[in-house]
Amino acid sequence: MPKHLAKLHENGDIYYHDLDSYNLTVNCLNIDTGRILQRGFNTGYGTINAPKRIESAAELSCILLQSTQNDMFGGQAHVNFDNDMALFIPNTRSEIRKEILENLKGLEVQEEVLNKEKIDELVEERLRLRIHQAMQGIVYNLNTMHSRAGSQVPFSSINIGIPKDKDAALICEIFLKEYEKGLGKGEQPIFPNIIFRVKEGVNREEKDPYYYLFKLAAKIAGKRMNPTFMNMDSDFNKEYYDKGIIPATMGCRTYVCSNISGEEGPAGRGNIAPTTINLPRVGILAKKDINKFFNLLDNRLELARESLLHRYNVLKKLRVKDLPFVVGEGLMKGSENLLPDDSIEPILKQGSWAIGFIGIAETLTAL
């Protein structure tokens, strides 16, 4: 790193996050969970086939988070968890129905016992039980399974609340209820961060079809301080929602939707690297001169940009084989046609490079 950039970090003017990973990997990722699960994946020891049942899909969704975190220094999110898990409900339902009919076959039962409505009712009852078990497994796994050489559990986030059908709504409801229960003795689950998305016409108002999910989420937030809520009707979210893109975020609030290098949307994208400007110091140095403050801030912003470009040029020297899961398995947008010895530069153009700040209240006090 150039000395003038290194000095900024050493002096506390600009903070470069996760220096120990500076030349090794990138920050975080929104996983296109449904797509990856439906095609299967390889964590390095062999191929994992696409799951057929909700229990398998739930378990493998945790493995996706864990394996992704082993390749990165930040967090991971399922961008559309309830809809993605719902993909595996029809097969599970069919399997349950087949089991029930096989058990009834050959038994002497009254005709009304075989009534289609009663069988449907029994199928849905057993389906709910299996979904409960699958969602409980997710809560348990994400608070116990370790990644990064055992140093922590995956920093996981799950986006829910905009179900495309009744199966997705069922996943959303049961997942929230299992999270509310907590761990084995009712302990607070630290993970996953849950982001419940609120949208007019979907779940915001009492007249909306999935309002009951919003009410359930609000009730659980009052008890568990989780989920947090994302307003799909805000201008910057509605712009994408109206295009058919459902915005998503992470517990750390990484938000990636716009894209100057390709297709918009969060899936397969995330933050590559962040920097943070020490804003109170800028306010103090300005000595209550607002023009001087903005001149100093412009200087800090330019230096932060320069530091990110330096990091970009360092990271583009990495090869696909250096990040074998997130890039080698095509989880990150831009990695689709790359070979093991190719540069990872295409994925660096698909994520955000963040310049943030700290201490706005203290800055205003100084000014």
Regions found by a protein language model. Give the residues of each.
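Conserved catalytic cores of very large enzyme subunits
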Residues: M1-Q350
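Contiguous, well-ordered alpha-helical segments that form the cores/surfaces of helical PPI scaffolds
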Residues: W353-A366
